[in-house]
């Protein structure tokens, strides 16, 4: 599922709304649980044509009007947290009503499945990182804006160790490509459907080709970014710059557009063009 095609096939298609709802409900408080959901457009433009746009992997709404951005992030980005905050402003802004409006908002959730981990000074290895706006006394100031990040490299349970439905979801998301058979603890209605949808042999030929291409881009791009992003500990500035330039050129060579490459590296399109000419 750590490919665009695989992720959207399993969670972003109309017949699989029950899979997405079951997964999201493991992360949500009771008052925001999803009973029914609808998919919304995944591309949003800024207020003017010159503004950046946001392209979500999956964007959906529940019956109460709560908004959910669901994304899969394969490679570490320098300004990933900034990007995450920026993207969450779009479903907030779209709630504005012309004319008289009391500014009441519905909840907005950003849920990101990460194929990497955040830098952490205290060595905590939390699979789930939940972020909300808090005051100086560490009390939640605003409860309708929530960011939930799943650091998949920290989840290492085996099939025999799975206890909760949430752990089962984490397990299949991380291990589905490695499994040769369905573990007994995952043989329920939801997960049997998930495995059925994920079975490559059941995909149409065109879908399978799209999957293989998506998988190739993921593996190549992950290899590039794993070596390109510099953590900043004693690495010469020029060396870091050279690796960034090479990574950008590699991303373009893999078929990404200038706009897509700018999204990947969290830089402007003009900066991408500048690096390509170096």
Residue ranges: model-predicted function:
Residues 1-278:
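Elongated, amphipathic alpha-helical interaction scaffolds
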